[in-house]
């Protein structure tokens, strides 16, 4: 395996200039340069106004996706530094401990790679947190059921088709009608990989699409990150059906539109395939997952304390009832007096808990490394307590009970669902409208970069050698297929921030000018 593959999907002239020492004050490796590409991307900036747990909060102390991702990045860096102190780890990744140059290069690349992917791990998440994913899944599942029912009962009669199908027929030449209906039927068929991209919508899959395509400048290579970074990013390297028997296929982790990109980066890293539609995980994806879990377990609880929903004393009681938790608690209490403020106590406890979970994760990573490489390890590092229930599992159960099901969160999640459903309804109506003027109005309200990215995919799919930006002004959305139009809607909506989505929804409904 080449776990640090610096190959990109498109050749980078900048990498070549660095290698030839043409860039005097830039000695970064290709993997190191990936971090800058993510930090300076618009998709990363938008994380500042996306929900972590608490939707539409005005409390500046509460985590957004961006602050959460920055903390995950910090933990990822800690993993890199701790792992590289272990000679056993260096042997496993092919670094000679006696070769200073190899050690420096290896540490710099590992630290940068984990920092990059930890920062980017939520870059594809829609507005309103994980409930936003559920809202998109439900919308498209219901839509497809309606369309399937129409096709099933129409018997070819246009009188029974719904508005979406009729609009497509009205904007298509009669000679192409049968082909259009057949294409729609194929898309809706059971086992359709393209259909999975919607009914199993996942922020991880959208994130891979953002990194590989949707940061659109003048081609469909997105940020053009190294294969090592992209392979490590993919939490569920699977573009087929979900299958919980394997950790790789637990979710539909890559859209069918990016299956060739997945194959390329995995092949570049030497990651074996798992059947026809999946791959083993890149080993470093386990580390990224652990860093994410450590942060959300602890910081979500800390946010709940800030909001007054739970108390430090409640958290203390959880830890007292676990042998490892008790050790962590005792260690943290050495650093403050009993009458210290709760905030001081929680910060110290956070530090000790993070240290504990990092150590647990590293121990499990090294203990099971051969299983991980062979694709046989099926647990999360943080939750693997061996024969005993892990401390992380107990904290997660409490978070689900006392935080994630809080009426305030659930109420705002339903608000988010109404907003997302309303926006998609609007674009479904007007991107499929029989009148061109309505379609063009809808087009001009959408992100130009995302529209051009889908245009470029369309041209590539039909074999037309055109550049999207040259034809954008006159392009009619009716020239898109059904799937391309809903792909455009999905990409646009999932990229919105919480506040932009609310404002956009109000404007579309005439509630705001």
Residue map of PLM features:
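C-terminal amphipathic alpha-helical interaction region
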Residues: 444-507, 511
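Acidic, low-complexity proline/glycine-rich segments
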Residues: 32-45, 384-391
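Substrate-recognition/cap regions that form aromatic- and gly/pro-loop-enriched pockets
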Residues: 370-465
């Amino acid at each position: 395996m080449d776990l640090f593959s610096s190959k990109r999907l498109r050749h980078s002239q900048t990498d070549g200039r660095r290698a030839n020492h043409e860039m005097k004050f830039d000695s970064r490796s290709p993997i190191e340069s990936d971090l800058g590409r993510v930090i300076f991307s618009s998709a990363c900036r938008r994380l500042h106004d996306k929900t972590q747990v608490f939707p539409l909060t005005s409390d500046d102390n509460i985590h957004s996706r961006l602050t959460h991702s920055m903390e995950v990045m910090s933990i990822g860096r800690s993993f890199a530094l701790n792992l590289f102190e272990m000679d056993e780890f260096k042997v496993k990744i092919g670094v000679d401990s006696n070769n200073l140059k190899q050690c420096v290069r290896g540490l710099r690349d590992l630290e940068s790679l984990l920092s990059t992917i930890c920062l980017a791990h939520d870059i594809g998440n829609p507005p309103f947190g994980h409930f936003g994913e559920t809202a998109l899944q439900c919308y498209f599942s219901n839509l497809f059921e309606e369309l399937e029912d129409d096709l099933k009962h129409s018997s070819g009669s246009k009188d029974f088709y719904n508005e979406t199908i009729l609009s497509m027929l009205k904007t298509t030449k009669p000679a192409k009608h049968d082909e259009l209906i057949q294409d729609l039927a194929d898309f809706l068929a059971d086992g359709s990989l393209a259909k999975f991209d919607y009914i199993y919508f996942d922020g991880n899959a959208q994130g891979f699409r953002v990194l590989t395509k949707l940061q659109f400048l003048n081609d469909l290579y997105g940020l053009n990150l190294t294969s090592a970074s992209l392979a490590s990013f993919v939490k569920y390297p699977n573009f087929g059906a979900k299958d919980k028997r394997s950790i790789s296929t637990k979710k539909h982790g890559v859209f069918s539109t990016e299956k060739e990109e997945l194959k390329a980066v995995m092949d570049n890293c030497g990651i074996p395939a798992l059947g026809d539609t999946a791959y083993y995980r890149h080993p470093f994806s386990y580390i990224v997952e652990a860093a994410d879990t450590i942060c959300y377990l602890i910081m979500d609880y800390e946010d709940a304390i800030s909001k007054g929903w739970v108390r430090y004393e409640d958290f203390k009681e959880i830890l007292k009832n676990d042998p490892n938790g008790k050790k962590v608690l005792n260690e943290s209490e050495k650093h403050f007096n009993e009458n210290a403020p709760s905030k001081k106590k929680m910060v110290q406890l956070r530090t000790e808990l993070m240290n504990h979970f990092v150590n647990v994760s590293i121990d499990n990573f090294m203990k099971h490394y051969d299983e991980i490489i062979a694709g046989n390890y099926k647990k999360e590092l943080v939750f693997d307590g061996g024969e005993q229930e892990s401390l992380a599992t107990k904290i997660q159960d409490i978070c689900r009970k006392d935080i994630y099901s809080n009426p305030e969160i659930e109420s705002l999640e339903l608000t988010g669902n109404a907003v997302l459903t309303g926006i998609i309804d609007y674009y479904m109506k007007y991107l499929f409208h029989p009148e061109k003027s309505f379609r063009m109005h809808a087009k001009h309200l959408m992100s130009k970069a995302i529209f051009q990215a889908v245009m470029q995919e369309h041209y590539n799919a039909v074999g037309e050698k055109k550049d999207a930006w040259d034809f954008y002004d006159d392009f009619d959305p009716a020239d898109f297929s059904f799937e391309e139009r809903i792909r455009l809607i999905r990409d646009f909506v999932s990229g919105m921030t919480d506040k932009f989505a609310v404002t956009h929804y109000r404007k579309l409904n005439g509630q705001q000018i």
